[in-house]
Each structure stands twice: as structure tokens, then as C-alpha cells.
Curated annotation (Swiss-Prot):
Pfam families: Ribosomal_L1. It comes from the Bacteria. GO terms for molecular function: rRNA binding; structural constituent of ribosome; tRNA binding. Signal peptide: none annotated. HAMAP family: Ribosomal_uL1_B. Belongs to the universal ribosomal protein uL1 family. It comes from Methylorubrum populi (strain ATCC BAA-705 / NCIMB 13946 / BJ001) (Methylobacterium populi). Part of the 50S ribosomal subunit. Keywords: Repressor, Ribonucleoprotein, Ribosomal protein, RNA-binding, rRNA-binding, Translation regulation, tRNA-binding. Binds directly to 23S rRNA. The L1 stalk is quite mobile in the ribosome, and is involved in E site tRNA release. This is Large ribosomal subunit protein uL1. PROSITE patterns: RIBOSOMAL_L1.
Length: 232
């Protein structure tokens, strides 16, 4: 614990805890403070002026990161026939119907994204208690219930990031790796923030995007001036 505390203190050196940094400067700091022996994920957190306990203040959506996420995404697809063939051709890791249902019911969930054709949603619905808590339940609002399984698989593999506001009004997501060029990280962050801004619910009142911070997996958080991230 003492060693970890020393590492964290060292990482925070040079950071002004109350300062709001421009996004370009914030990313430079995040990259310079990343000291783990693996390629850390760069993460964004956004505090929103919503109360997700109210249905008209729920924020949910998907963002296609222009430069990808840098992570390997394992994709499962519930489909039959030609659509199953499309999913396999697009690079889905596991494709099936009743057979895939049995695998998931057996507790074997070796995928990060789940896609389904509309006709198989009654089947997939049986897995609500398994997939729901893991954020894996297919949903038409984020493009994972679709007949275009080829496009959905390509998007998931290419860096599509789903987001959903948590109870405290916070959204967070991985938007790249510390090995990415600074400009690519900035572009990804701006794209993600723009997607969240466009997902503003009708019931949101007051300032919608209140605070933004970026960090790496093992690094300190860096507060960001929202106006340097938001395009509008």
C-alpha cells in the first residue's frame, strides 16, 4: 500500500488539482503520467446535470470513435441463416441462436458486445437477467438490435463505444490507449463528448455537461475545461 501511495503521489506531481486544463494539455499530462508496464486505457468521465431515476432524464447512446478504441472487442451475434453468415463474414467471434442461448445460460460469456436480429429478440429476452447487469443486452437505441448485422459487427470491432449514465449522473468510457497520438485521442474525446451532448434528454434542466475529466487506467485524473472539448 505504501508503494502504491508513493506512486500515486509521484503521478500527481505537477498537477494543479483545481485547474481546468484545455483538452490538448490534459492529454499531454495523461500520457506523461501513465507509468504502468502495459498500454493503459485513456478514459473520460463526464458529470451530467440529470437524475437517471427519472425516465425522461436517461442518457444512453453509442459513439463511433474516429480512431478506434485500441481494444480487441469480442462480438456475439444472435442470428440465423443468411444473417448468421453475414455476421461470421464480418468477423463476429461467436454466432448462433438456441445453441448460443444455451452457452450463455451455462454461464459462458466470452464476449464484450452482443448483437441480435429483431426476430431473435424473444429468444434473447430470456437472457435479460444474465446480460442486463453486464450491459450486454442488445438494444435498438444503440444499434445492437438490427438486420444490418454486418454493419453492427464492423462498428463494434472498429471502435463503437456504448454509453449509459449511472445513478450519480456520471458517464465514463474508454476512448483510446496511451500509445495513441495525442491528436487521435483528442479527436476521439471530442467525438465522444459530442455524442453525449446530442443524447441530451428532454427532461434535463440547467447545465447539462457540468464537469469533464480524463485519466489513464493507473494515472491521476485531470480536470478539463468543457469548452475545449465540446464542438457546439
Amino acid at each position: 500500500m505504501a508503494r502504491e501511495g508513493k506512486r500515486i503521489r509521484a503521478a500527481r506531481e505537477g498537477l494543479e488539482p483545481t485547474k481546468l486544463y484545455a483538452i490538448d494539455e490534459a492529454i499531454k499530462l495523461v500520457k506523461s503520467k501513465a507509468s504502468a508496464k502495459f498500454d493503459e486505457t485513456v478514459e473520460i468521465s463526464m458529470n451530467l446535470g440529470v437524475d437517471p431515476r427519472h425516465a425522461d432524464q436517461m442518457v444512453r447512446g453509442v459513439c463511433n470513435l474516429p480512431n478506434g478504441s485500441g481494444r480487441t472487442v469480442r462480438v456475439a451475434v444472435f442470428a440465423r441463416g443468411a444473417k448468421a453468415d453475414d455476421a461470421k463474414a464480418a468477423g463476429a467471434d461467436i454466432v448462433g441462436a438456441e445453441d448460443l442461448l444455451e452457452i450463455v445460460q451455462g454461464g459462458k460469456i466470452e464476449f464484450d458486445r452482443c448483437i441480435a436480429t429483431p426476430d431473435l429478440m424473444p429468444l434473447v429476452g430470456r437472457l435479460g437477467k444474465v446480460l442486463g447487469p453486464r450491459g450486454l443486452m442488445p438494444n435498438p437505441k444503440v444499434g445492437t438490435v438490427t438486420m444490418d448485422v454486418k454493419g453492427a459487427v464492423a462498428a463494434a470491432k472498429g471502435g463503437a463505444v456504448e454509453f449509459r449514465v449511472e445513478k450519480a449522473g456520471i458517464i465514463h468510457a474508454g476512448v483510446g490507449k496511451v500509445s495513441f497520438d495525442e491528436q487521435k485521442l483528442v479527436e476521439n474525446i471530442k467525438a465522444f463528448a459530442d455524442a453525449v451532448a446530442k443524447a441530451k434528454p428532454a427532461g434535463a434542466k440547467g447545465t447539462y455537461i457540468q464537469r469533464i475529466a480524463v485519466t489513464s487506467t493507473m494515472g491521476p485524473g485531470v480536470k478539463v475545461e468543457p469548452s475545449t472539448v465540446l464542438t457546439a
